[in-house]
Amino acid sequence: MSSIWNLISHGVCWARRGQRRGRGTAVLLSLLGGSAWGQSLLSAESWCDFGQAGPTTALPAPVALSAAHGQTRFFGTGPGYHDADLALVSALEGSSVDWDAATSHYADRVEGVCALAASSRTLRAAQVLSVGPIAFIRPGTGDVQVPRHSRAVIIDLRELPAAPGLEEALARAIGAVSTAPVARLSERVRHHIGMTDEMTPESEYSAYRNFVEPRAREPYAATGRAELPVALLTGPALAPAAARFAVDLRMAQRAWLVGAPVHTAVAESKWMPVKRKGMLVRTARLEDAQGAVPDVIPVDSSLSHFGLGVGSSDSVPSAQALQATSFSGVPTPVDRTTPVVRNAPEKRFALEVLPPSAASSGIARADLLILHGATRLFFPYFGTVGDGIDDRLLEMLALVDAVPVTHVQQTQRLLLRFNEVLQDGHGFVYARGGPTPAGYFAVYLDEIGGEPVVRRSVVPDVHPGDTVTSVDGVPMAEWLSVETAHASAATPGWKHEVAARRLVNMNGPSTFGLRGVDGVTRFVQVQPQPQMLLGPPSFRGAGSLADLGAPELHYMNLANQVLSSVGQFRAALAAAQGASGLVLDLRGYPNFGSYEPRRRLIPTPFLTSVFRTPVWTGPEEFGWQEEQGEIEPMSNPSFSGPIVLLVGPKSVSASEDFSMVLTGARRVKVVGRRSAGTNGVVARLLMPGGMLAWFTGMEMLFPDRSTFHGVGIVPDIESTPTAVDLAAGRDTELLRAIEYLRTGQ
């Protein structure tokens, strides 16, 4: 291979003779300038000084800071969840927030994060200047066409902004002067299969996990007509993609570095703009077969050999100086004798010591941003429910600015209101360490016509069939309006259930307005009771339906309070042998983790539901892990006769998972009311102040791949009780199931 330096020398001499040829020559002469960078800059410390910012963003600053913190929290090489979250709290304290100051404050306190002023530069169109045998490339948008007579190439990486499209522009530049693909370094990054549960130590049975492994990068594709020698011009600060490009090419011995050394930490970072400032967040460690690459990639020449000093960026080396230097062949391997001090990302674990209960405006703001960032990365249903989380975040932050947060219940309510926009029936928020209720309103409520109606009660003077019309003088319609605005749910029935549950917690005696089945409203003062009234809508045990006039039919209640094990299920199913029909009650919550009960109810091979989990391979590559299986039936005992499935608005999650398979196999007739439309393993997010937020972490589809979320199990036959039915203890859904099994209608 010809000496690139001799070619550069020839080109510079040619350029000097032809200065009158115009602006292109002047540009080349200027861009060949450089500064001398001493060996003292080869330290890996203060890598922030060597990064180039990118443009700002159109996103509101809180949304952008949420994204930056999400990168740090879930992909960064710095501290774990809790320490990064506390840095965010510190940055967001006060009566209001200066988002630029908060960005700097946050970056100062988090390892692997740098705050920089955003740049106004954008990625311009690619430029190719030809000076004799030298092609000078300024990467940018559009194709790169290298003149046929070119014998060497200079690619200028200086002052390129960390703007969208830069990585692709650089790939086009090297591709245009290569006939063979150029290998790229792998990057050790954190992988996420769903969002790891932050409350429970991970086990082999965990649905979600994270781990750290190398991620291979595709080589730079070759599109050129000739393999040309390449020199890269580097400045004191580079955009992350430009630094990555330089490290890739120099480690592959594909290019020389001229100008300033390249700090590998910059190449391992990602630009995250916030407002007038932004952050470089380091998310990887670059590696090859020998391990981590050096912290600093030294230049092959600082150009001081050519008579240039610091600050002489407009100077041009003399032709004599260039001719005196000859680098032939390919660059020598980069020296790797200096120990690498850059850390790699580490696996994230659940916290061993939980955050203490605390409240402040900074905690509330930080928790809102943390929850927003986590759902942005891991909530799977935006395509189904719509994406309103940015506007909801701004709405909640405005409330914090308006009313300072002084107790944990305020933070909890803000987070509940945020979660409401997800329309997710698992969207709960718990305040650890908050005040304990004085007791409970010990009734079991059902929803009839949009009103809470008592199904069971152990409270004196409160009876089944009573409709709750008010609480402490607040009309129930008004009370429910406030609470449903803080209740996340995918279907109306479950939304009412989530809101109405909050009637149960009592801080002291309360007066309830109650409308009896006779239409008369009375007011009853209720004392808090020591226990809640829990359980499924019905506690009826498995057995014959002879007491309801159908001795030929059998009933099985799968609620965990009634049938708590697979062994009990087998015994109940054996007792049902010979029945002409079976009523399967899934209005409660089952306790079966295996597919065995379904295998004994479906006599032919069947498909499971489709489980789709979000997967991040480092911070850039998103995909899905999808699982669906075919299951074989089991016998002895089993049941192959007609089955009616009972569901209702409290049929949620595991109840629905059981039901999805039965309905997907077309094994049952469904009677009752629509279920909650919420299934999938919960992701649990632990935040400062002792806040624990839940959301569904995987997408669930029916076995035929149709949408489940927000649809739920829809009855073939609608059946809704009345207040009179509840007062009489009449199970109308069960009676309707019996009617169908006996008449087929």
Positions of PLM-derived features:
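Flexible, low-complexity junctional segments that flank or bridge functional domains
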Residues: 38-240, 244-592, 596-599, 603-612, ...
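A hydrophobic, small-residue-rich beta->alpha segment in the mid-to-C-terminal subdomain
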Residues: 712-724
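Flexible, gly/ser-rich surface segments that form the specificity/activation loops bordering the active-site cleft
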Residues: 676, 680
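Alpha-helix C-terminal capping segments
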Residues: 663-665
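Flexible, glycine-rich surface segments
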Residues: 242-245, 632, 642, 646, ...
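N-terminal secretory signal peptides that target proteins for export/translocation
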Residues: 1-20
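Bacterial N-terminal signal peptides
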Residues: 25-35
